[in-house]
């Protein structure tokens, strides 16, 4: 900022840092300390372990034992995927049922589950029973669920036991939004101000939020649900579309957490991003 005398005057900045990643909580340099924990003093190691123990819902006393320390080391950073069994990943295998020259295919179906597209191709008995024995001479193509071993078995994951959605009313919120809510709270608190104090100091149209995922939200509460629900017997909804937008996390924090009317923007990726 230039003064009337033409000299540059430094602008005071109050900067906060917050968030959550596989190493833990960003504020207070806790996540960084987890990365270099073997090089820290005993006192700083203990503070880092205690911070992670509380985050992972393992804090019992003001100190932790060696078993707790080993658990924390094994369940932070990059490690074997814990969210699902990597040796048993659901897969769909296409199959075709072919009738022989002399016999028809026979199988049981419940009335409500007979697809409309197959009714004209099936010999459906006239019965009041809920389960019908149907026959057909035509080829029937189906997808048979089976399991395969994942080619990816390790990844960076949030510390085991940490659930950002349990910290607020997060019903139907995608995982990325839950993490953004936590990150925004962590960052604001690290400045030493509360949200109410910031609102009193800064006009709502001068608060900007820039946040988002390059790929948008992809879990079952967002684009994942929008794209897969119709294929697995569930109902997709317009809510999945709105919650999947890349900028949605930033917009949500801006509108519902801060009550701001300032600028928002998402972080959109491209091939060159890598």
Predicted segments with their positions:
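Conserved "HGTGT" condensation-loop signature of ketosynthase/thiolase-family condensing enzymes
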Residues: 1-215, 219-262
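Short conserved active-site loop signatures built around small residues
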Residues: 274
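Short pre-catalytic strand/loop immediately N-terminal to key active-site residues, enriched for Gly-Thr
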Residues: 262-269
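Short, structured patches in soluble enzyme cores that scaffold and shape functional sites
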Residues: 213, 269-271
């Amino acid at each position: 900022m230039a003064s009337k005398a033409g000299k540059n005057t430094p602008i005071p900045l109050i900067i906060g840092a917050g968030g959550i990643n596989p190493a833990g909580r960003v504020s207070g340099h806790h996540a960084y300390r987890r990365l270099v924990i073997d090089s820290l003093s005993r006192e700083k190691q203990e503070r880092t372990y205690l911070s992670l123990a509380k985050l992972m819902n393992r804090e019992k006393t003001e100190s932790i034992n060696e078993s707790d320390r080993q658990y924390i080391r094994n369940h932070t950073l990059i490690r074997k995927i814990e969210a699902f069994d990597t040796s048993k990943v659901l897969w769909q295998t296409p199959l075709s049922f072919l009738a022989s020259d002399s016999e028809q295919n026979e199988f049981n179906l419940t009335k409500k589950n007979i697809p409309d597209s197959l009714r004209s191709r099936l010999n459906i008995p006239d019965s009041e029973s809920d389960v019908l024995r149907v026959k057909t001479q035509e080829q029937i193509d189906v997808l048979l669920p089976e399991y395969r071993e994942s080619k990816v078995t390790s990844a960076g994951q949030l510390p085991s036991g940490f659930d950002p959605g349990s910290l607020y009313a997060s019903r139907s919120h995608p995982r990325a939004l839950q993490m953004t809510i936590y990150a925004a709270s962590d960052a604001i608190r690290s400045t030493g101000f509360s949200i109410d104090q910031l609102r009193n100091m800064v006009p709502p149209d001068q608060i900007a939020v820039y946040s988002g995922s390059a790929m948008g939200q992809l879990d079952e509460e967002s684009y994942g649900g929008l794209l897969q629900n119709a294929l697995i017997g569930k109902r997709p909804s317009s809510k999945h579309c709105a919650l999947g937008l890349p900028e949605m996390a930033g917009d949500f924090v801006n509108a519902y957490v801060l009550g701001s009317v300032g600028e928002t923007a998402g972080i959109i990726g491209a091939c060159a991003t890598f």
